Amino acid sequence: MKPVLLFSLLLWLTLSQALGYDFVVAQDGSGQFRTVQEAFNAVPDFRKKVTTIFVKKGVYKEKLILAGSKNLVRLIGEDRKKTILTYDDYNQKKNIFGEDKGTSGSASCYIYGADFTAENLTFQNSSGPVGQAVAMWVAGDKARFKNCRFLGFQDTLYTYGYGSRQYYEDCYIEGTVDFIFGSSTAWFERCTIFCKTGGFVTAASTPDSTRYGYVFNQCRLTGNAPAGSFYLGRPWRPYAKTVYLRCELGKQIKPEGWDHWDKESNKQTARYAEYQSRGPGAAPKQRVAWARQLSDAEAQQYTLQTVLRGWDPTQE
């Protein structure tokens, strides 16, 4: 390596680490890397300390994969609305063999590594209303997203990981059909859920052996969809579990609230509930008979540490 290049690299490492960042990503070349994937690849496998990556403003069109060996990665954007990680795959888009990519293959970003944190970023699937098109696919355990946006249409956020615990705080999530879906246990704190066109907010596939699925706490459900065009959820698998606590529900929410996905037996196995919903979409007396309104005592059982099995994502 030439002395000048080595000096420049060491200087950048010193400056970025002084700011609390291990790596800086910038499209203009002012960081160590021009792409986020390069920074992901540079994270040492199975490192036992946090690796912090700062991403400068820009639209980064990349299909991202954070490998399972890349743990404790913290990804921070310079500006939530101006630091955009995007790609445009979708379910029926063909791979190099002429086969459909499928829903899982459509994701713009895959997170396999455990203890991942993202802040001040936009994750987008820019393919448009073309069917299933995932913006974020999370399999790793103990994933945290703070002040992030998730943009798409159908199947925007795939909480994929079996046994995975996920936490979303002050995030914006938009979509049409089943745009928050999967088998993971996920807590959504003060998030804005934006309903587009019409459809279903959630499609949990919670396993029978998992006590908690989705918990929305103090969230706001709004959107530009017509009044009465959205269900709070439907069960992708029989034992789906979704609870809304102290949420503001916009006019987009149907009075009946929940759908059983054309399968009568789901009414006996799915666990859907609300507590102190408010707003024009809150209609407890008109909800389907097989969903519940929680008592004060029942609602108190829903705490971060209980739902997330001892993990407190608010602690660094």
Task: Say what each PLM segment does.
Residues 21-316:
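Sequence-level preference for short, compositionally simple segments enriched
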Residues 4-14:
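Sec-dependent N-terminal signal peptides
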Residues 16-20:
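Boundary at the C-terminal end of the N-terminal hydrophobic targeting segment
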